[in-house]
Amino acid sequence: MYLSRAVSPRNVPVFSTGSFALDVALGVGGLPKGRLVEIYGPEASGKTALALHMLSMLLIRSLAKAIGVNTENLLLSQPDCGKQALSLVDTLIQSGSVDVIVVDSVAALVPKGELDGEMGDAHMAIQARLMSQALRKFSHSLLLSQTLLIFINQVRERFGGPTEVTSGGNALKFYAPMRLDIKRIGLIKKGEEFFRMTKCLCLNACAHNGKSSLREDSEEQARSAI
């Protein structure tokens, strides 16, 4: 079989982020269904707010409420450890009954061995191995269920290397076809209220499966204020 016949460009169905400017900047109209997306950035940069705003678009289209999250249709879970959380995510994906899953956050996915150990014990790369195993399993299930899986992640400083790195090892960078770097760039005052202005940088927008593009033309880095 020729490669040109086996792999054909196609538009991937998406979920809107709730921001028209960001949807346009992403190049595909939103966050792709059946894929894994990472939203990361420093604290108080708007990562969780973006995820909640997108959920509000799915739960109530009219956006009658200020934030719009319909708590009657929103499942909230607070697992005891990282393995339990990722096992729950796997169950939800395979059920095919959930459109969007948000994991907030990667840094909070503490391995059980670390919870059971003593303070000061060395637990090198346990979380990275846990994430790597889970993402290998998720990648195929997401395509079958067309569920969107969003991981919210923090950045931290690392000595002797890049100024900022994300938690959870390198597996998330490899498996996520779209990574959104969120940064706060200022505040806007309207009357007595302050609103956060955020800049979003889309780092890569190619599907992991075969490294194919999410749309026909190649995706450039996109910036958008949300």
Swiss-Prot record:
Matching InterPro entries: AAA+_ATPase, DNA_recomb/repair_RecA, P-loop_NTPase, RecA-like_N, RecA_ATP-bd, RecA_monomer-monomer_interface
Subcellular location: Cytoplasm
Any one Gene Ontology BP term: DNA repair
Entry binding sites for ATP: G41, P42, E43, A44, S45, G46, K47, T48
SUPFAM superfamilies: P-loop containing nucleoside triphosphate hydrolases (SSF52540)
TM region(s), chain numbering: none
Superkingdom to which the source organism belongs: Eukaryota
Keyword DNA-binding attributed: yes
Keywords on record: ATP-binding, Cytoplasm, DNA damage, DNA recombination, DNA-binding, Nucleotide-binding
GO function terms (MF aspect): ATP binding; ATP hydrolysis activity; ATP-dependent DNA damage sensor activity; single-stranded DNA binding
GO cellular component: cytoplasm
Family: Belongs to the RecA family.
Function: Involved in recombination ability and DNA strand transfer activity.
The name this protein goes by in its record: Putative DNA repair protein recA homolog 4
